[in-house]
Amino acid sequence: MDALSDVLRVAHLTGGVFRHAEFFAPWCIATRVGPEHCAPGLGPVLGPASHLIPYHYIIEGEFQVRVDGEDGADLTVGPGEVVLVPRNDLHLMGSDLSLAPVLGSDIIQPPKDGGLFSVRHGGNGERTRMICGFLGFADAECNPVISTLPPLLRLNVEQGGAAEWIRSTFQYAAEEVAVGRPGSETVLAKLSELLFVEAVRRYAEALPDGQTGWLAGLREPHVARALALLHRDIARRWTVDDLSREVGLSRSALADRFIRLIGLPPMHYLANWRMQVATQKLRSTSASLAQIAEIIGYESEAAFSRAFKKAFGAAPATWRRSNG
């Protein structure tokens, strides 16, 4: 398993769709998504998600979008594009962002017959249609992917090998959900997850030389190899010597590159990642503490418990009772 896939797996990435929106120029709204905005029945889809990433898939027309407070960082998006808001910041969308914004939550209309929430708002000008959805993450504040993404992330689904499939499937499933057809929400949930993974991969591929951060580490061959090894075999009793030998670098060269790109030494990264996997196991499985300790590479339950309490301020059993 590659490192990106492993990080997203542990984060319990989930997706869904909650709104069909239709706007007519001139218009401007301010919005941030919360669980209360998601369509009925999507609570189970969210699962243990503690963080939501809204996205907007544009079907027709174009508009501007920016994160509130980020003046001068407007994006113009049009048909076939998806814009994601990785930190779920309050963001402005509209035909003209200089207009006084209306709160998105004030213009949402409730779903009918098990379909989507809907919005119809604006003047008498050009129409813009979009589908709004979300990605749910568990423990996003500790997730190395989320922390390195920009405030706004744009994906053009017209580009890439799967463009036609993504576009046609998304539009078909959205139409099915809008009329309350059973099973279509599941299709859109999985497609939402695919869109996010594709957006992250394309963003990582387009990073400029000299960029730092976890995603930039995936572009440096030796660091990417080290990350893949650590994620693939988390239970191994890794040492810096072992890892440097596997990736074909000296200890010092690997440590320098890893720290420059990832921000901390390889063994510190591994220790942090083991704790993230531990929280996932504690929250979503019935595995014993001894079993979890073995899975993530600790020699004993006691050693695992000490490390966990140091990281989170509570013993694993206590944490499980509070977060299960």
Model regions and ranges:
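Double-stranded beta-helix
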Residues: D96-T128, A140-R154
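Generic protein-terminus/edge-of-domain signal
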Residues: M1-L75, E81, L92-L116
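An amphipathic alpha-helical interaction segment
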Residues: I131-A228
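Basic/polar phosphate-binding segments, predominantly the helix-turn-helix DNA-binding elements
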Residues: L194, E198-A204, R225, L229-Q276, ...
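Residue-level recognition of short, solvent-exposed, well-ordered loop/turn junctions
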Residues: G78-P79, P86
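Cytosolic nucleotide-binding catalytic cores of signal-transduction proteins
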Residues: Y269, K281-L282
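Short helix-to-turn junction characteristic of helix-turn-helix DNA-binding domains
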Residues: I58, L230-D233, L282
